[in-house]
């Protein structure tokens, strides 16, 4: 997924969504 394009805050929320 794109984890470098998203900011730090978004990255955290994104990782949470990816984990689920």
Swiss-Prot record:
**Which cysteine pairs are joined by S-S bonds?**
none
Keywords, alphabetical: Chloroplast, Photosynthesis, Photosystem I, Plastid, Thylakoid
The UniProt regions of compositional bias labelled Basic and acidic residues, in chain numbering, are 9-20
Q: Which coarse location class applies to the principal site listed for this UniProt protein?
A: plastid
A biological process (GO) of this protein is:
photosynthesis
Provide the Gene Ontology terms for cellular component.
Answer: chloroplast thylakoid lumen; photosystem I
Instruction: Give the start-end ranges of region Disordered.
Output: 1-20
Where is this chain's protein located in or outside the cell?
Answer: Plastid, Chloroplast thylakoid lumen
Function in brief? Probably participates in efficiency of electron transfer from plastocyanin to P700 (or cytochrome c553 in algae and cyanobacteria). This plastocyanin-docking protein contributes to the specific association of plastocyanin to PSI.
Question: Its family?
Answer: Belongs to the PsaF family.
The protein here is known as: Photosystem I reaction center subunit III
Tell me the organism.
Answer: Pisum sativum (Garden pea)
The opening ranks of the lineage are:
Eukaryota, Viridiplantae, Streptophyta, Embryophyta, Tracheophyta
Q: Which gene specifies this protein's sequence?
A: PSAF
């Amino acid at each position: 997924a794109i984890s470098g394009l998203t900011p730090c805050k978004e990255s955290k929320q994104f990782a949470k969504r990816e984990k689920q």
